[in-house]
Structure formats: C-alpha cells, structure tokens
Amino acid sequence: MIKSELVQRIAEHNPHLYQRDVENIVNAILEEIVSALARGDRVELRGFGAFSVKHRPARAGRNPRTGEHVPVEQKSVPFFKTGKEMRERLNRDGLDGATPPSPPAA
C-alpha cells in the first residue's frame, strides 16, 4: 500500500471528510513523526509500534568491486519496533487472512 491508497481508504471509511483533508491529516502525522525523530524523540503508538532512531558507529567497509577498504561514516537510521497487539494479530490472522506458515520441523 502506498500513501495515496492509505488516504483513499481512510476517506472511504470517513465519508464526512474530504479526501484532500484526509491527505493533509496523513501528511501532518507523518511530518510530526519525522520531526520528533529528528529531535531524537521516540514516537510510540500503543498497539501499533514505536519509531526511534538508532545510531550506527563509523566502521571500515569494503568496496565489493575492487575489494578496497573504505571508511563508512557514523549515521543515524530510523527504526520501527512492532507493538505486541500488531504482532499478535499478524501471527493469529496471518497475511490477507491466510493461515500463517508452520515453523519448519526440527
């Protein structure tokens, strides 16, 4: 699902809202999440999950073509941890309502 499909589905479930208003709301929510992460804050949506920033230290990398060692600078990356309710629902219902795959036999 892409953002425009999300906006369309929300608008369909809320006929009292114009699609452009739903789009503005979705954009505002996403912008607030990004702004909070940029400030170093954690964003927790109970039952859904939590967004945070992980800091990766500088390290030595390798160019796969030449094998040359290259320095890789430290960086910050977004991280999402699913909430308990979401994990339970996905494991219970599976994807698209299908039965989740069984674990491999030991």
Swiss-Prot record:
Region named Disordered: 57-106
Amino acid composition bias (Basic and acidic residues), ranges on this chain: 82-95
One family name in Pfam for this protein: Bac_DNA_binding
Domain of life, per lineage: Bacteria
A GO CC term assigned to this protein in UniProt: chromosome
InterPro entries listed in its UniProt record: Hist_DNA-bd, Histone-like_DNA-bd_CS, IHF-like_DNA-bd_dom_sf, IHF_beta
MF GO annotations: DNA binding; structural constituent of chromatin
CDD domains for this protein: IHF_B
Keywords: DNA recombination, DNA-binding, Transcription, Transcription regulation, Translation regulation
Annotated GO biological process: DNA recombination; regulation of DNA-templated transcription; regulation of translation
Gene3D superfamilies, A to Z: IHF-like DNA-binding proteins
Protein family (similarity comment): Belongs to the bacterial histone-like protein family.
Oligomer and partners: Heterodimer of an alpha and a beta chain.
Record's function text: This protein is one of the two subunits of integration host factor, a specific DNA-binding protein that functions in genetic recombination as well as in transcriptional and translational control.
NCBIfam families named in the record: hip, PRK00199.1
HAMAP family on file: IHF_beta
Name of the protein: Integration host factor subunit beta
